Structures are given as structure tokens and as C-alpha cells.
Regions:
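Active-site regions of enzymes building and remodeling cell-envelope glycoconjugates
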Residues: 50, 323-338
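Interdomain motor-coupling "hinge/lid" segment immediately C-terminal to the ATP-binding subdomain
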Residues: 10-12, 18-20, 24-158
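Hydrophobic/aromatic beta-strand patches that form the interior of the parallel beta-sheet core
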Residues: 15, 49-51, 216, 264, ...
Length: 341
């Protein structure tokens, strides 16, 4: 199709959408047969620019959800607390986003109808479509193992130690049996991966542990539906067991959309962990996510107190403010955290 347009004399901009799963899988198969340098034969090299399409982030959701509130949101910067009326309104919008996630059809349905049942139905349909794609394109990767990994996200994140454990997939499961399935899901952008760093040391890429990581879902709303968490629990119960992982998934989703680079986490052992770590230039930014039961904050606070990093962030439901050695940033500002440093 692209070649037909490019071979003519008509000059126009063409926008095409797709998962590229067929291209990726086809390329992988040719690479095995023709060597690692094999390219998809039908790909119009040099004629297209690729853009990654993500679920709507919170700012995009807010723009559709409440245009007037979004206009105020766009003006927020610095570390001064927000007026309480705006803080409460933005928390309400954040709660709605945690329920819907950022899949456009789901967001549109919620804004038009505000029907939790319809939201859940649409999300289950999307989950089923993703699983159908896995069966369709899984091929030599073993679709069954890909599905096992994808369906394990909720129990994996529900563990006290959220690190991905192969043995939790099924009895006797080994890394070499499922590594390819995980790489397929990451490449297809169905899951998000955060690697552990063994030291808080620049550059983080040099201390990244390739065999220690957490897997999160593409979209927080789909993860919530997979976990069968009703909207009422999100609003009325601030401390149910899965609230923490759900909020972490939300924060990771927003951070990855900021373009600030790879998001990692730090863990010396299960009880000594910093939720996320960003490298901004040469600065290491420790991040605490306070979403549910507070299990790991001691490590974050100790690091901030002893190392005195230039930037340190705690995301929570509290208002924007400087709090000792770190900045408390409301969860609804995660997508624009850099404006608050």
C-alpha cells in the first residue's frame, strides 16, 4: 500500500495505524532463517516515521473528562500546594482514571454514560482481543506460554515481593521456558517491564540486573479489570491489598509517557526497596509510590536522609508540597512531575 502511494506523483501525508505484530513476527522468523540482519521484505524503509501509540495518559484523559479543569491543570508548576477545591476535583478525576484506564473507547464510554458495567464489558472485550492476537501471532513463540505470563500479572504483583518469579507460573517452571514469551509480550507492548538495579549508581544501565524485573500491564484500567476490583473499592477503600500494585502500574504508565527514559526500581532484598528510580541527566531520582499499604517507605526515607539526592519524589494522594528532603507530588501530577521539581 505504501509503495503504491510513494511511486506516484501525488504528494500527501498518509497516517496508518496497526500493532505491527505481523511485521515483527515475520521479521523474527526471517531473522532465524536469514540471519539477525534480516528485514521485513515489504517494509518501506526510509519512507515512514514510526510513532508509538500509548493508552491515554492522565492529562489526555482529563482534557476529555473535564475541559475546564484541564485548563487549570495545565497551569500547575512549582511546589506550592493547590487550592483545596482543585485538589479534591483532581483526585476525583484520578480515581475515575484508575477505574477506566486510558483505552480510548473505554474513556469515551465512561464520559458519555458513566456506566461502570459498560466500562467493565468493554475492558473484558479488549482483554479477549489481546488474547486472540496472541493466539494469532504467537506462532513459534508458544502462544500458551505467552498467555500464562500475561494472565499471571495480577498474582505476580499481589506477592509481597513483586519481582517476577518463574516458579509462580506453574510448578517446575524455569526461566528458559518463558523468557521468549516475556520478550514477545514486551516487544508487542502488552506488558511494561521495570528492571532492578543492584546499586543506586550512575549510570543505571551499568548496574541493571537483567534477571530481576517486575512486569506490569500496558494499561492500569485493564489490570484493574483483570483483578476484578470494582469502582467502589477504588473510591471507598484506600488500603486493600492490590491497591499498591495498581497505583504503581498507574505511575509507571505515566512516567514512561513522559519521555524521561527507562524506569527501574532498586531492591537489595524484599524488605529493602525503592519503588522506582529515574535517571534524569546525571541525577538519580528515587521515587516512592504511596498507594496502599506502606511497606517500603523506610528504604526511600533512609536513602533520602543519607544520600541527599538533588531530587526525590513521593507520589501520594496528599497535596503538592516540599516535605523535608523530597517533594510530595499528588498522583494526578505524575505525568508532569518535572514541572514540580
Amino acid at each position: 500500500m505504501f509503495l503504491k502511494f510513494s511511486s506516484g506523483t501525488v504528494h500527501m501525508a498518509i497516517v496508518a495505524g496497526g500493532s505491527l505484530l505481523g511485521v515483527k513476527i515475520g521479521s523474527a522468523k526471517r531473522s532465524r532463517m536469514e540471519g539477525d540482519g534480516a528485514k521485513p521484505k515489504s517494509y518501506p524503509v526510509g519512507k515512514v516515521d514510526l510513532l508509538d501509540v500509548e493508552p491515554m495518559d492522565f492529562a489526555e484523559f482529563l482534557r476529555a473528562f473535564d475541559g475546564a479543569l484541564f485548563e487549570y491543570y495545565e497551569t500547575i508548576s512549582g511546589q506550592e500546594p493547590l487550592p483545596d477545591i482543585f485538589h479534591r476535583k483532581l483526585l476525583d478525576a484520578y480515581d475515575a482514571y484508575l477505574f477506566t484506564g486510558g483505552m480510548p473507547e473505554v474513556v469515551d464510554s465512561y464520559i458519555r454514560n458513566c456506566d461502570p458495567e459498560e466500562v467493565g464489558r468493554l475492558q473484558r472485550d479488549l482483554i479477549a482481543l489481546y488474547e486472540d492476537d496472541i493466539v494469532k501471532y504467537g506462532g513459534e513463540v508458544n502462544a500458551g506460554r505467552v498467555l500464562v505470563v500475561l494472565r499471571s500479572l495480577v498474582p505476580q504483583l499481589s506477592k509481597e515481593n513483586e519481582k517476577f518469579i518463574y516458579g509462580a507460573l506453574r510448578e517446575g517452571a524455569r526461566g528458559r521456558d518463558y523468557e521468549e514469551a516475556i520478550e514477545w509480550l514486551v516487544s508487542a507492548r502488552m506488558v511494561r517491564r521495570a528492571y532492578n538495579v543492584k546499586e543506586m549508581k550512575f549510570p543505571l544501565s551499568a548496574v541493571e540486573m537483567q534477571n530481576a524485573f517486575k512486569l506490569y500491564h500496558l494499561d492500569v484500567g485493564l489490570l484493574r479489570e483483570l483483578a476484578a476490583v470494582p469502582q467502589s473499592e477504588l473510591v471507598l477503600n484506600s488500603d486493600f491489598d492490590f491497591k499498591g500494585p495498581l497505583v504503581e502500574n498507574y505511575v509507571l504508565q505515566q512516567l514512561q509517557n513522559t519521555g524521561q527514559g527507562e524506569v527501574r526500581y532498586f531492591a537489595e532484598r524484599a524488605d529493602r526497596e525503592i519503588d522506582f528510580v529515574l535517571q534524569v541527566g546525571a541525577e538519580l531520582v528515587p521515587i516512592e509510590v504511596k498507594g496502599g499499604k506502606d511497606k517500603k517507605a523506610a528504604t526511600f526515607k533512609t536513602y533520602v536522609k543519607t544520600k541527599k539526592p538533588k531530587f526525590a519524589i513521593r507520589f501520594s494522594r496528599m497535596n503538592l508540597r516540599k516535605d523535608g528532603g523530597f517533594v510530595n507530588i499528588p498522583l494526578y501530577l505524575a505525568i508532569k512531575f518535572d514541572k514540580c521539581l
